[in-house]
């Protein structure tokens, strides 16, 4: 159950980051008249997702040692990279993909007790 909560926390915080990116993009490209309203909506959604993620993280910390739980959050780097690449069309070079692979391997190795 604790690992499921960690996965949910990672998903919520990654989506929160993407909402912040969307807010920044809206601020940059929308006319001034629409900018505040649309950006505010994305920022509120980001705050909601990150806030729920924080509350669930507190539950995780009640059940897993910090030294086990915290490294699992590095999956956020993987999720944000994938979502940014496929959702925003951001370019991810070969070195970045190698870094992502090493993060996944590191998470696997740390959990192999």
From Swiss-Prot:
User: Which keywords annotate this record?
Assistant: Cell inner membrane, Cell membrane, Lipid A biosynthesis, Lipid biosynthesis, Lipid metabolism, Lipopolysaccharide biosynthesis, Membrane, Transmembrane, Transmembrane helix, Transport
What compartments host this protein?
Cell inner membrane
Q: How does it sit in the membrane?
A: Multi-pass membrane protein
Q: What is the lineage of its organism?
A: Bacteria, Pseudomonadati, Pseudomonadota, Gammaproteobacteria, Enterobacterales
Organism, scientific name: Pectobacterium atrosepticum (strain SCRI 1043 / ATCC BAA-672) (Erwinia carotovora subsp. atroseptica)
Q: Name one GO molecular function term.
A: carbohydrate derivative transmembrane transporter activity
The answer to whether UniProt assigns keyword Transmembrane helix to this entry is: yes
Q: What is this protein called?
A: Probable 4-amino-4-deoxy-L-arabinose-phosphoundecaprenol flippase subunit ArnE
Identify one Pfam family in the record.
EamA
């Amino acid at each position: 159950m604790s690992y499921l909560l960690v996965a949910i926390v990672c998903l919520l915080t990654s989506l929160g980051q993407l909402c912040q990116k969307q807010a920044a993009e809206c601020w940059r490209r929308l006319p001034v008249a629409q900018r505040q309203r649309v950006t505010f909506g994305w920022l509120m959604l980001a705050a909601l997702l990150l806030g729920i993620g924080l509350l669930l993280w507190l539950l995780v910390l009640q059940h897993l040692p910090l030294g086990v739980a915290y490294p699992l959050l590095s999956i956020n780097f993987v999720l944000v990279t994938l979502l940014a690449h496929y959702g925003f069309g951001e370019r991810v070079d070969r070195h970045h993909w190698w870094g992502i692979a090493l993060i996944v391997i590191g998470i696997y190795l740390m959990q192999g007790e």
